Design a protein with these regions (language model features):
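Conserved core positions of repeat-based scaffolds
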Residues: 1-2, 11, 40-43, 52, ...
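Short glycine/serine- and acidic-residue-enriched loop/turn motifs that recur at repeat junctions
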Residues: 3, 10-27, 51-68, 92-131, ...
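Acidic surface patches and DE-rich sequence motifs
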Residues: 4, 45, 56, 86, ...
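Repeated scaffold domains used in trafficking and secretory/extracellular systems
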Residues: 30-34, 38, 71-75, 79, ...
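Glycine-centered loop/turn positions within well-structured domains
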Residues: 144, 162-163, 195, 229, ...
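A detector of tandem-repeat and repeat-rich interaction/domain scaffolds
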Residues: 252-266, 271-275, 279-286, 290-304, ...
């Protein structure tokens, strides 16, 4: 943002990324899944190809490049990176050439030495993801990706560029979120920021973090959904309970009256629920219209982001309530403003 001498404001738009425009995304007729990747939206099509559109930061130059992806069966994102599960059970990730250094490492080593150390450690950190096979589901957190295997066990890996957060000898996250190797009889996995949650086939929960007392009482969990630090679950009777509550300033956690739910999507400050009859409801922040979904019908999948909600219809169309986050920057020039003297 730039303030001119005449009192007007100039606002630059962020860079566009992806292989499609938003108009092209909304004209897709063979979509099966949508995933928010920060300020971008990625859509998986029936042919195993991925279409995406949105805005990228300068350091995310390659983070939306998916043109070479083929035979994708599932997408997952942690807002920064996009991952694709391939039909043969292997996993792809959008390219990231940089490094991410924790504040503690910077403080300890100083910037120059920290960067030198980070580059060296990234080179020797095992790339565990490249060796994965027979994966049937993936979930991504801040420092870890978790894969559910066909036999009900799980594998996990840290991201080599996360210096100070990933053990460069083992390739596992230092926060303990990769400690899933002893889990069995799993039905679903959910990677959050600093934690991984597992749902067993008997409806009980596992976590790599400290187990909350109330979780120990659950034996009827049907599915788990979440993002970042927030997680919610659908029970066998179709009701919803929050496992890790979100910021409730806008009522995001007000799901106690929901029934007949089959899927949830947790956004930045809103929660979306898909009913078994294909209708959708949402609660929380609605500043961009992201909760205006009550008229939707025949929906089979939902995704919630910062300022938007996406629904995939039975016939493969993509519906959007709200906006892409980058669409906040819709004006190049704002009206004149007065600036106090001094």
């Amino acid at each position: 943002v730039c303030l001119k001498q005449d009192g007007t404001l100039l606002v630059t738009e962020p860079d566009l990324g992806g292989n499609s425009t938003m108009e092209e995304i909304l004209s897709i007729t063979d979509a099966v899944q949508a995933v928010w990747q920060g300020e971008s939206l990625a859509v998986l099509c029936k042919d195993g190809m991925v279409r995406n559109a949105g805005y990228v930061e300068y350091w995310q130059e390659y983070a939306t490049e998916v043109n070479d992806w083929r035979n994708v069966s599932m997408l997952a994102s942690n807002n920064s990176d996009l991952f694709g599960l391939i039909k043969d059970g292997s996993v792809l990730r959008t390219e990231f050439d940089g490094i991410s250094i924790s504040g503690s490492v910077l403080k300890e080593l100083g910037e120059e030495k920290a960067i030198e150390t980070a580059k060296r450690q990234k080179e020797i950190t095992p790339d565990l993801i490249a060796k994965w096979k027979n994966i049937k589901e993936i979930s991504v957190g801040s420092t870890q990706i978790v894969g559910l295997l066909a036999d009900g066990s799980a594998v996990a890996a840290g991201f080599p560029e996360q210096i100070g957060r990933v053990d460069y000898n083992t390739g596992l996250a230092l926060d303990g979120s990769c400690k899933v190797d002893e889990w069995t009889e799993l039905k679903q996995i959910l990677a959050l920021f600093g934690e991984t949650i597992g749902l067993k086939t008997n409806g009980t929960l596992l976590t790599t973090a400290e187990m909350p007392e109330e979780w120990k009482q659950y034996s009827d969990i049907e599915s788990i959904w979440g993002r970042e630090w927030t997680a919610a679950a659908i029970r066998s009777d179709g009701t919803v309970v929050y496992l890790r509550e979100g910021d409730d300033r806008y009522g995001q956690n007000n799901v106690s009256g929901w029934t007949d739910m089959v899927q949830l999507a947790v956004g930045e400050n809103h929660t979306v629920g898909l009913r078994s009859d294909g209708t959708v409801t949402a609660v929380g922040d609605n500043f961009a219209g992201q909760c205006d979904v009550e008229d939707w019908t025949n929906i089979v999948s939902v995704a919630a982001g910062e300022s938007g909600t996406v629904g995939i219809t039975e016939d493969g169309r993509v519906l959007l309530a709200g906006t892409l986050p980058g669409d906040y920057f819709v004006a190049e020039t704002w009206p004149a403003v007065s600036v106090p003297e001094g």
